[in-house]
Amino acid sequence: MFEHAFEVWSPHAPHVPRAHRVFERDGWRCTAPGCSSYRNLQDHHVVFRSAGGSDALSNRTTLCAWHHLRGVHAGIIRCAGDAPDHLVFELGLRAAGPPLARYCGDQRIA
């Protein structure tokens, strides 16, 4: 009986949507530098699945809809590395020249 209860109420129970595991790990907040939005959260694959990326938690991060759709998928923001602690965000991507800023977490690195 206790085993069943532990399985059902475990934070990693199979019935919990995968995205919720990512959101929970990231504190239910957008992980883009300077953003703390808790609305319209989306599960982002750091290495896109279409490019061979996995569903592993280390390849996924939480982004708000704005940073996900108008940033990453619009080609203005790039995210690379292993989640949650080793993600590098490049902001202000341009056709010529380096990105305007690079962050690891909320720490600016370039």
Write out the residue ranges for each language-model feature.
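A boundary/linker detector
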Residues: 1-110
